[in-house]
């Protein structure tokens, strides 16, 4: 294939697309480049469908190669291993706007791989990867209702920035990614510094406008190469079988969906029983029945048709009657309860229950050495706040092996982390490293937002001086033609059978995080705006209920949390405190039982569960790094005697000076040992500090009041 290139300019920055040179055996391959960031994206489709499944088998991988940033991996084998968290999040960012655009019923395996080949710190690669994934999919001829593209929107002062640099993202008030097609918005994800809803809506609109040029460029790119997608027609269901399912099940399903008093388990059990009875009825059909001609094939279609019937009836009930399966109105939140200190010894914990969704969050406070060092494309990257999310099988009543953290758990933890970070205190105010673990104990929708609420409770319980409490809510959507219903606080069945899962978190004053995924091919800005505005009332209601348990951070930390003391020492004295081979700092730790962490700028953090031990270590370090002043009087200890020369006296930890034999007393001294012995406490004055930093001391000319002052220090 001959190389083909095309470029598009988005808000003054050129983005280039090229194909035909790299990865020629992949179904579709495109190199996306902007500045000096280059991402190779490939899309490959299996030649045959994967039979026996009822989902689309799409796999998206995002590969960070550290050579892209001129680095060698820090692992023992010096090779990239399991994808880091940022790579997993980038893969999910690519997946979410693409997945709804593949046709229903399409079950060929598709794999999209985005490999970062070069990294320019002015151009984050994830946005380029989304553009490349869409283009590569179309180049491969895979059935796909694209193109789709994305852009990042930042906010500096009052100005929005399209595709900001890493520095602008870090210093700005907003990090928002919006993806869309020409039909509408497909995905939104954002972290914000408590911005008003109106600013978020304006940012989405601004970003969606910037996406249009990339959509046009892709269309021209594919048209110029004369790529035609593979013809695909979704297999049609036998209308006789559809009628059979609707006739036999609709009335019973509708009755269950209107039984508002049923719990989730009771409703699920009744629906399962109806589905089982449907199968029994089908199996009992006579041989002469036309549905029996392809009995095995038709029987395998029953579960999907039953789900379709349930979905249709639930959606109709919401659209026509405005009633949900639990009897709530469209904007009503489920019953809420909150509690803190539900388990002993931990540094802080919060239990948040909303309906049958329940999350326990636990806070652990640590020191600087507990910060997470990230071995990824970003050098010297570390985190002082970590949020980990666990979703065991028992939370949904299932048997599931516990085999590590999946992509979903990483994504939910990152979203909760993003929601909390803007309200954390500055490091100088609260120098702890903070880890929060959210344990999902029961799941019936919106566990990620439950994690945000439980974590806010836990942080306040731990005594972390957060700026404002944060709450979160998940919004849903039912859309049939022009009929639209927005749901507040969706539960599992509404998420499963609905069109949107839109999570919004924030304080009383504004939004800190949001994430929108849809199952349809785009929604308008007007629908999105309505969902954001409706979410505010839900968030504030939830926040009010949360604050019943605890309304502000505790003044005292848990007795089991470490006590931190900080001090600043001159950078040139770091080596003195550490000592040769770490000898000095080890001695301080052994003597006091405290932990000592020293940063490159001279910040020293001393920690211990026993505050007295931390104070003792701090005083030792202060003494070691205190500057000795000329003409000042000190109480010191004799450390060495040099016959006929004098005595060395330690006036501060690690700082010794010489008292010459002529300076030992007002009278003539013939022998040093006649005046002093090793271990004696003695009051001395600093006579001078020579050019080499050597301290000369004297015992002569010291006023009695100075002696008393020195002994009293």
UniProtKB/Swiss-Prot annotation:
PROSITE patterns: KH_TYPE_1, S1. Its EC number is 2.7.7.8. It is found in: Cytoplasm. Keywords: Cytoplasm, Magnesium, Metal-binding, Nucleotidyltransferase, RNA-binding, Transferase. GO terms for cellular component: cytosol. SUPFAM superfamilies: Eukaryotic type KH-domain (KH-domain type I), Nucleic acid-binding proteins, Ribonuclease PH domain 2-like, Ribosomal protein S5 domain 2-like. InterPro entries: ExoRNase_PH_dom1 (IPR001247), ExoRNase_PH_dom2 (IPR015847), ExoRNase_PH_dom2_sf (IPR036345), KH_dom (IPR004087), KH_dom_type_1 (IPR004088), KH_dom_type_1_sf (IPR036612), NA-bd_OB-fold (IPR012340), PNPase (IPR012162). It catalyses: RNA(n+1) + phosphate = RNA(n) + a ribonucleoside 5'-diphosphate. Mg(2+) binds at residues 495, 501. It is an enzyme of class 2 (transferase). Gene3D superfamilies: GHMP Kinase, N-terminal domain, K Homology domain, type 1, Nucleic acid-binding proteins. Pfam families: KH_1 (PF00013), PNPase (PF03726), RNase_PH (PF01138), RNase_PH_C (PF03725), S1 (PF00575). Residues 562-621 form the KH domain. Residues 631-700 form the S1 motif domain. Its cofactor is Mg(2+). One of its GO terms (biological process) is RNA catabolic process. Its main location: cytoplasm. Belongs to the polyribonucleotide nucleotidyltransferase family. Involved in mRNA degradation. Catalyzes the phosphorolysis of single-stranded polyribonucleotides processively in the 3'- to 5'-direction. This is Polyribonucleotide nucleotidyltransferase. It comes from Gloeobacter violaceus (strain ATCC 29082 / PCC 7421). The lineage of its organism: Bacteria, Bacillati, Cyanobacteriota, Cyanophyceae, Gloeobacterales.
